[in-house]
Amino acid sequence: MNVRLSDDPERQNALLRSITWGLTKMAASTSWGPDLDWIASDKDGHLAVFTTAGLGAIPTRVTGDPAGLVVVMVDVERLRGFDFEAEGYIQEPARIGAFGFDYAGDRHPGQYIAGRPYHRIGQPPAEPLSVESLGPDAANYLRDVCFPRLCFGDSREIVVEDAFEEIHRPTDWDQWSRPELLHPVAPRPEPPGDEPQSHT
């Protein structure tokens, strides 16, 4: 029997270290970043998992608050009985009641392209998880990481740059871009050290 994140501070800390390292590396990168998953909400309070494919834009709220993402994951695990890997990857988002979006889509672009959407993947969840079912810390985080004009169930593609004032993107190079979307890039942090080791 696996111990839940909510009952295992050591496992929570390992997940936090891993996610912090990945988000910082992505935000600091000027080439391909690590492939990461992050979670957001929509206007209906439903959740979606976004997979960066090493290139997709991420709201600064996510890169600046890895602990907030971990709090969401702890609540999702508690509600859905889903065990997150130490790296935080989420296979088959519908299993946790979330929609799935991937920056690569059917064809990986090979580089960051401003305005390129994340594409919906997989099956929609049979029973979408709602922000209202999460604890107050997770709900507050997801109110900030929200696409307030979109419904994930109605969306086939989502452009992160259209919904957030400030983003991180893992590259300084792009072509065929929408130049108006290049201005909200947050300052790059210092790159992290070595990747944290999993103690699982």
Residue ranges and their predicted role:
Residues 2-61, 66:
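Short N-terminal edge-element motif at the start of the domain
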Residues 66-200:
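Low-complexity intrinsically disordered segments
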